[in-house]
Each structure stands twice: as structure tokens, then as C-alpha cells.
Design a protein with these regions (language model features):
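Conserved P-loop NTPase "ATPase switch" module shared by AAA+ and STAND
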Residues: 195-207
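Basic/charged alpha-beta structural segments of nucleotide/phosphate-handling enzymes
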Residues: 18, 42-43, 51-193, 260-270
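Walker A/P-loop
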Residues: 2-18
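Structural recognition of the conserved hydrophobic beta-strand(s) that form the central parallel beta-sheet
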Residues: 36-38, 64, 200, 224-229
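Conserved RecA-like ASCE P-loop NTPase motor core of nucleic-acid helicases/translocases
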Residues: 18, 31-43, 227
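Walker A/P-loop NTP-binding motif
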Residues: 17-28
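Conserved RecA-like helicase ATPase core segment
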Residues: 211-271
Length: 274
């Protein structure tokens, strides 16, 4: 187990380094599993680039995946069948249904649910709570800390009520796509393919909390994780401020380092040498 952060400004060879090292190591260790983790929308381009660069013009023992595709790889390996995924239209229908059922208990949103775009806004909020690993219990605790009765507090109480009804309805029936990564995090240590695998990561500016939850589980379980970040090595150290230019990569490097240290995973940080 090891963590390597590859740093460098834009167009300084980080991606070239990732491809070169990944191909080299995969050819030297043909019996080992390699994963190339990229944003979900970039998997096709990454596969094409890998095939072009590989001497054998094939991905061989390298699996190009996004976080969601990685979920399905693990589920398939374990013969695990997750609950049926609810699409966007289905989410809207369920939200509208549960809001209708608890409409009389809503403090603010009861009269607004028929407005154009309202259900979509609620759906987006729910998606973000799952992506950022904000549970219903955390929201309830936050609302309890509000002591006033202003508009924001009343809206938050409505949101908590609707989310609770939404999750009650979904339980034992469906999953939303944003919940898949939480299931993946729970299943990682059951996967033989991920055990001792080498994972290369490129194309991300940062990770959501639920993605970090997956990476935290992978760090001690994989043989090595190599992640590229667009930031000069000199800028990567020290504290960061949310509004500074390179806040996202600095924050992510800091979080990965903290997760690695807490789990006794060795860390190497430096620029790419192509």
C-alpha cells in the first residue's frame, strides 16, 4: 500500500507520466490488476488514448473506469445485485408523491411544489446531499441547532421532512445513482480484483466527500494509488484558503495525505519525470 501524488502545472507532462508508468508497470506485472480512474465522462477518450499509446495496442490488464463504472465492476465480481436504480424522471415522481402526502405538514413548501422547476430544485438538493455524504441524521442535527424561526430555518425543516419521506419510500425499493458510491465503499474489502491492485488517477480537479470515502477504503487495500494534480510542487504545501486559485488540488492533496497517514500508508509527493 502506498500513495503517490504527481504534481505539476498544466502541460508539464503529468498525463504522459501517468500513461508511461501505467503501461510500463502493467507489462512488467501481467498477473496484477491495474485500474485507470478518470471522470466518468472521460472513460472513452482515456481508453482510446491508452490503446494508441500501448505497444500492443490493447488495454490488456488495465481497466479504464470512472467511479460509477468501478462500482459495477465490483458488484459484478461479487455477484451483488444492488437495488434498482431510479432515473431522473422516477426521482421527480417520488418527490412529488411524498410531498403530496405530507403537504399539510410543510411550513413553507406546501404551496410552492406546483411551481415550475421546484421539484427539479429539490431533486438537485437531494443529489448533493448524497454526493457530499450529508446524511439525513446530519441534516436533522443541523436543524436542531437553529434557534430562530426565519425563512431559512422553516425551509430546512421542510427539506428534512421531505427527504425523510423520500428515503422511507426508497428503502428496500430503489437506489439513486449518487448512492452507488456509498455501496461501493462498503464492498471494496470484499473485492479480490481491488486487493493489491495498482490504481492510477488523472483528470480530476478534486473529489466529492463520497468519492473520498471510496479512496479512503482503497488506500490501505490497493497495492498503490498514483494520483495526478494540476498544481506546481512549490504551491502544493502549506495551508490553503477556499478562495485561492489552487484551493481545490491543495485541499485534495491535504485530505489524501491525512487519510494515508491515519491508515499508515506511505506517501510520496513530487513532480512528474517524463
Amino acid at each position: 500500500m502506498a500513495l503517490q501524488c504527481v504534481l505539476g502545472a498544466g502541460r508539464t507532462g503529468k498525463t504522459d507520466y501517468i500513461y508511461q508508468q501505467m503501461i510500463k508497470e502493467s507489462m512488467e506485472n501481467r498477473d496484477e490488476n491495474f485500474f485507470f480512474l478518470v471522470p466518468d465522462q472521460s472513460t472513452l477518450n482515456a481508453q482510446r488514448e491508452l490503446i494508441t499509446r500501448h505497444p500492443n495496442h490493447g488495454t490488456m490488464n488495465i481497466d479504464v473506469v470512472g467511479f460509477y463504472r468501478l462500482s459495477y465492476r465490483v458488484f459484478e465480481e461479487l455477484s451483488y445485485i444492488p437495488k434498482e436504480l431510479l432515473n431522473d424522471e422516477g426521482k421527480s415522481m417520488v418527490i412529488r408523491k411524498v410531498m403530496g402526502e405530507c403537504r399539510k405538514d410543510l411550513l413553507v413548501f406546501g404551496s410552492g411544489m406546483e411551481k415550475q422547476g421546484f421539484i427539479d430544485e429539490m431533486k438537485s438538493f437531494f443529489a448533493e446531499t448524497y454526493q457530499y455524504d450529508v446524511s439525513l441524521e446530519k441534516l436533522k442535527e443541523a436543524v436542531k441547532s437553529f434557534e430562530n424561526t426565519d425563512s431559512l430555518t422553516l425551509k430546512m425543516k421542510d427539506i428534512v421532512l421531505v427527504l425523510e419521506k423520500f428515503e422511507d419510500y426508497m428503502k428496500d425499493r430503489y437506489l439513486v445513482s449518487e448512492q452507488l458510491l456509498d455501496v461501493l465503499a462498503q464492498k471494496i474489502t470484499e473485492s479480490e480484483k481491488l486487493k493489491g491492485a495498482t490504481i492510477y488517477i488523472d483528470g480530476f480537479t478534486g473529489f466529492t466527500p463520497i468519492q473520498n470515502k471510496v479512496l479512503k477504503k482503497l488506500l490501505p487495500y490497493a497495492k498503490k494509488i498514483v494520483a495526478a494534480f494540476t498544481i506546481d510542487e512549490k504551491r502544493a504545501g502549506g495551508p490553503y484558503r477556499d478562495y485561492e486559485l489552487f484551493a481545490m488540488p491543495k485541499k485534495e492533496i491535504s485530505q489524501l495525505k491525512e487519510m494515508a497517514v491515519r491508515q499508515g500508508v506511505p506517501i510520496q509527493i513530487g513532480r512528474a519525470h517524463v
